[in-house]
Amino acid sequence: YQPTGWERVDRALEEMKLRLDTADNEEKFQAIGMIGRETLITIAQQVFDSEKHPTLDGVEASKTDAKRMLEAYLKIELAENSKKVIKFAKSAVDLANQLTHDRGATKRDASICLISVTAVASLIKSIQLTGK
């Protein structure tokens, strides 16, 4: 994993890794999901510009609507190649949300969440750096 340079994102990903190493119960695994969810929101906030990235459904994205912000960003930045990447990013949001609310959360679930959030962070940073 290459740090994104987004301090809050990098700090949160590191925190997720540290917590995963020591987590030993459902509540601790759920907390990793919560950090993952917040990290995805932060990533979306780093790149989303409502003036440049109109939402696909015309509904204004709230400051915490990671799915809508990422979808709008990716649709503009990747154009016709965006469909599968949007699906991937939205799936990462779903995984983090699911883990946050899963009262039977496991270490495997938390690990999958960490991997997906890390992948989205790297993906979005790469898109931002490479431009069109």
Predicted regions and their residues:
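Charged alpha-helical initiation segments
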Residues: Y1-F29, K132
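Arginine residue identity/basic-tract feature
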Residues: R8-R11, R19, R37, R68, ...
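Short hydrophobic alpha-helical module
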Residues: R19-A23, E38, T42-H53
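Residue-identity detector for glutamine
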Residues: Q2, Q30, Q45-Q46, Q98, ...
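Short acidic alpha-helical/loop segments enriched in Asp/Glu that coordinate divalent cations
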Residues: E27-G33, Q45-K63
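Long, charged low-complexity segments
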Residues: G58-G131
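Amphipathic, well-ordered alpha-helical segments in soluble domains
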Residues: R8-E15, I35, T42, F88-L95, ...
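Generic macromolecular interface patches on structured domains
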Residues: E26, D49-S50, T106, I127
